[in-house]
Amino acid sequence: VIHQGNGGLSAARNAGLDAARGDLLAFIDSDDTIHPEMMARLYQALSSSNAQMSVCNYALVDEKGAMDRQGVQAIRDEVLEGKANILQKLEDGNWYWVVACTKLYRKELFRTLRFPLGKLHEDEFVIHHVLLGCDKVACISDALYYYFQRSDSITGSAYSLRRLDGAQAQFERAQTLLDNGMPPSSAYH
């Protein structure tokens, strides 16, 4: 257990990264839940395909506990191979690919990466770096992560200038992908 003051989600994730001793990492937001078999299924998909990352689908859960699988842009059971195929998922404009919490990662992907402190949309600042480190990504179509949507959450709150962090993350992602030879259409979505 790590005891530290509230420094936000990035600080908590970074503390976990710094203290991690195993070979695999996962991030679960404190107000969300997971299927009891999520980690075992992600591990099996990752290890059987020798992938650097595995990912599952998610379901939205409202404040009354009702689960909505209809609004989710589902992924299919597949193993993505090659950076171009993996990074293509960012071009699809699917929010699903930029969140950290539906995935199991090999720790080596975060060897030099940390989440930016004081930013909203912190996942979006690092996901392209993570995906650039992957040669294979194993995908599971089942919704094993339950994303709790609160009306007073950061993503559900009224506009503020801090919401521009998402635009900054997208710009940095576009620049990084362009620097790594991705065509402009891939970089700007």
Locate each region found by the language model:
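Nucleotide-sugar donor-binding/catalytic module of glycosyltransferases
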Residues: 1-168
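C-terminal, non-catalytic tails of nucleotide-sugar-dependent glycosyltransferases
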Residues: 81, 168-188
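Short, conserved alpha-helical segments within structured domains
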Residues: 122-123, 187-189
